[in-house]
């Protein structure tokens, strides 16, 4: 039980996919200008990452490995992710049309979010079992969500702040992301 908790904490805080592994930077920078859309994107990404991790594990364990088709792993995982994203898009469209409009193009772009594919591939490379794969996917999603929501809240405050002209827009966003990354480095000694 404690190894599962360590895996979760390590994935969320210590080995954060955005700030440490630099995966998922496109939605991190693209959707983080408004807190409302960042929260919606976080929920959608959490659902997709967790479900894609579980399904990718099942596809790899029960289809690719037994038939010695590991060379198709990346394509199979991309197909699984695309199916999960389509399902998520239909679910979001049915439950919240406003959120679907707010997320716009970013919802289908979860398919190309390298964090989702990265989690699926790292699950296989680190030889996680079913429960560890689910925890790893959920932890990566929670870490992504925390960083995205914190960053969007800071960007909303920066939009109202008196920022010098050369630093407006993307420049101050990158500086803020760097400072956030430094803050998360404080968690490095938390999990061995």
Curated annotation (Swiss-Prot):
Question: How the protein assembles, per its UniProt entry?
Answer: The complex is composed of six subunits: RnfA, RnfB, RnfC, RnfD, RnfE and RnfG.
According to its UniProt entry, the function of this protein is described as: Part of a membrane-bound complex that couples electron transfer with translocation of ions across the membrane.
Q: Which organism is it from?
A: Shewanella loihica (strain ATCC BAA-1088 / PV-4)
Q: Which Pfam families match?
A: Rnf-Nqr
Which domain of life does the UniProt lineage start with?
Bacteria
**Coiled-coil features, chain-numbered ranges:** none
Biological-process GO terms, alphabetical? electron transport chain
| Catalytic activity, EC | 7.-.-.-
What protein family is recorded? Belongs to the NqrDE/RnfAE family.
Q: How does it sit in the membrane?
A: Multi-pass membrane protein
> Keywords for this entry?
Cell inner membrane, Cell membrane, Electron transport, Membrane, Translocase, Transmembrane, Transmembrane helix, Transport
TM spans (from-to): 5-25, 39-59, 72-92, 102-122, 134-154, 171-191
Q: Does the keyword rRNA processing apply?
A: no
- This chain's protein is named Ion-translocating oxidoreductase complex subunit A
Give the location in the cell. Cell inner membrane
